[in-house]
């Protein structure tokens, strides 16, 4: 259910400020978004998997908190990230 090492490395290099920047808010949000999108396909097939659905809701909540933090700290980076990820906000 998790992302492959290659997929994570690609996201880190795309959204990170440096090559090994895996801790910035943008990278964390991008990784959570990729995992959320991956799980949405899982739930199309496994509708009664409530255990994984709880994990999905936790990821969505964590992403929401990180986006709120980024919006408070730097609105320009927040808007750019929302645009790059294609999130609704």
Swiss-Prot record:
GO CC field = cytosolic small ribosomal subunit
Could you tell me which InterPro entries the record lists for this protein? Ribosomal_uS15 (IPR000589), Ribosomal_uS15_bac-type (IPR005290), uS15_NS1_RNA-bd_sf (IPR009068)
Biological process GO terms, please?
translation
Its keywords, alphabetically, are: Ribonucleoprotein, Ribosomal protein, RNA-binding, rRNA-binding
User: What residues form the membrane-spanning segments?
Assistant: none
Q: Which residues form a coiled coil?
A: none
Q: Which SMART domains match?
A: Ribosomal_S15 (SM01387)
Name the CDD domains for this protein: Ribosomal_S15p_S13e
The record ties this protein, via SUPFAM superfamilies, to:
S15/NS1 RNA-binding domain
Q: Which PROSITE patterns match?
A: RIBOSOMAL_S15
Q: Name one GO molecular function term.
A: rRNA binding
Q: Which family does it belong to?
A: Belongs to the universal ribosomal protein uS15 family.
Self-association and partners: Part of the 30S ribosomal subunit. Forms a bridge to the 50S subunit in the 70S ribosome, contacting the 23S rRNA.
Q: What does this protein do?
A: One of the primary rRNA binding proteins, it binds directly to 16S rRNA where it helps nucleate assembly of the platform of the 30S subunit by binding and bridging several RNA helices of the 16S rRNA.
Q: Under what name is this protein listed?
A: Small ribosomal subunit protein uS15
Gene (UniProt): rpsO
